[in-house]
């Protein structure tokens, strides 16, 4: 089983898809990575040679932050916004949508399950 950036790549998937299992590598970056290393996107991860794995590892480590480093950087950015008291930091602190989405309706994922309030008595 091929292992890159601390992630076991699925054996039977094409490399183009298998690389997207790494946090921080999506479809576009996966194609770019395969072009840089000269590996065919149709190759399965079980068929990779050690040299190809080493080439992939080198390009990933030298060009991009992925997995734990990227997650830490994102968390640090959120913490910084909260500390400086920006509007986005305030939204993060309150657990509300950060990027201007409406909250009168929707936003259930960010706000959590509905908290029912007793209706008005007649």
From Swiss-Prot:
According to the UniProt record, where is the region Disordered? 93-122
Q: Which GO terms describe its molecular function?
A: rRNA binding; structural constituent of ribosome; tRNA binding
Q: Which SUPFAM superfamilies match?
A: S13-like H2TH domain
- What keywords is this UniProt entry annotated with? Ribonucleoprotein, Ribosomal protein, RNA-binding, rRNA-binding, tRNA-binding
Q: What biological-process GO terms show up in the record?
A: translation
Alphabetized InterPro entries for the sequence: Rbsml_uS13_C, Ribosomal_uS13, Ribosomal_uS13-like_H2TH, Ribosomal_uS13_bac-type, Ribosomal_uS13_CS
* Family note: Belongs to the universal ribosomal protein uS13 family.
Q: How does it assemble?
A: Part of the 30S ribosomal subunit. Forms a loose heterodimer with protein S19. Forms two bridges to the 50S subunit in the 70S ribosome.
Q: What is this protein called?
A: Small ribosomal subunit protein uS13
Q: Which organism is the protein's source? A: Corynebacterium urealyticum (strain ATCC 43042 / DSM 7109)
